[in-house]
Every structure is written in C-alpha cells, then in structure tokens.
Design a protein with these regions (language model features):
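Conserved core of the PLP fold type I
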Residues: 1-98, 108-128
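Conserved core segment of the aminotransferase class I/II
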Residues: 125-193
C-alpha cells in the first residue's frame, strides 16, 4: 500500500542527519524506514485529538525539519483522530514555515458510523498555498485486500518525478494483476471519490 511511498519519500528526501518530526507514538515501520536513511526523528506529542498543534509549531520553528510525518486519521498505534480544526492549523503551519507535511492516510476510508474529518489533501483548498507543501499517501490495502499492496502518492511535481524514478529503479512497476484489481474496484464505485 502506502508503505512503498513512505520508503520512496525517505529515499528521495532524507540525507543523514536531517530532522523529521513524527507523532509520538507513530507507525513503527515508518520509524525504521526514516532511520534507515539517517533521519533524526523528533517526537511531537499527541492527545485524543491527534498531534498537539501548538507543540508541533514550536518544534517546527526550533528544528526546521525536512518534513513532518502525520497519520491524521486513526493514527497508528494511538488511534487518535486529528480534529478538523487541527488539520487546518497543520496546513497553515506548512505554509507559514514552508515545511512539507507527509500525510499517511491508509485508514481514511476504514470507519464505522460518523465519517472522520476530510484528509489534509481534501482540506488543502481551504488554506491557500498549502497544496505545494503537502504529500499525501494512500492505500487500498486496508479496505480491499492487505496482500494487494497498491497505494498512491500525491506530491509536488519535482518530488513525484524523483519518487517515480526511484520506483522504476526498484521494481519497474507494481504487479499488473494488482493494478487491474484495484482499477476494477475503483471503477465499480465502491470507494468514495
């Protein structure tokens, strides 16, 4: 799913010693991935509404990170759900501090009852200029099939071009069968647009 996208972000963006802000706690595989490329991880505190944006802004101003990594919807392992207000604040911070935010969104369509707030990507039109500071990674692995390993990355063009080259060097392309299965699922309208 989105795990390969996170690896491509690490591979194309992180140099040894670069600072990356992550939620504390955050997804173990991401910690391992970013550390593999030499990142110094800085932990931003989380409560029941997700990352504490006042603390996050202090950390951004102090450390000037390469990027901020967040799982706004049902954070792993905390399960925290970043409120709509805080999501907007994160986008405003990205613009104010000219800092990339990586939104890992594998769980955005995996809910029961009331829908979670829109993704940072969906909210970005509300905050002028924020789209250029946002990388969004998504996955079908949680809602369709864990073994499918089909995901996507929406990113600024220059970063996406570098990630595409690294993807092609790594494995040429994702399985044709997996891509066709994902396309069939999406064309059938079983997932919200």
């Amino acid at each position: 799913g989105s795990q390969q996208g996170l690896d491509l972000i690490g591979k194309t963006m992180i140099s040894p010693g670069d600072k990356v802000i992550v939620e504390g706690p955050t997804f173990l595989a991401t910690i391992q991935c970013f550390r593999l490329y030499g990142a110094e991880l800085i932990s931003a505190p989380v409560d029941g509404q997700g990352v504490k944006t006042d603390e996050l802004e202090k950390l951004i101003a102090e450390h000037k990170p390469k990027f901020v990594y967040l799982i706004p919807t049902f954070g792993n392992p905390s399960g925290a759900l970043l409120s709509a207000e805080r999501r907007k604040q994160v986008l405003q911070m990205a613009v104010k501090h000219q800092t990339l935010v990586v939104e890992d969104d594998p769980y955005g369509d995996l809910y029961f009852g009331e829908a979670p707030p829109p993704s940072l990507l969906a909210m970005s039109p509300e905050v002028p200029g924020s789209r250029e500071w946002l990388i969004h990674c998504g996955s079908l692995s949680k809602v369709l099939s864990p073994g499918l390993r089909v995901g996507w990355m929406i990113a600024p063009p220059e970063l996406l071009a570098r990630a595409t080259m690294c993807k092609q060097f790594s494995d040429a392309h994702t399985s044709t069968f997996a891509q066709a299965t994902a396309a069939h699922y999406l064309k059938a309208g079983r997932m919200p647009a």
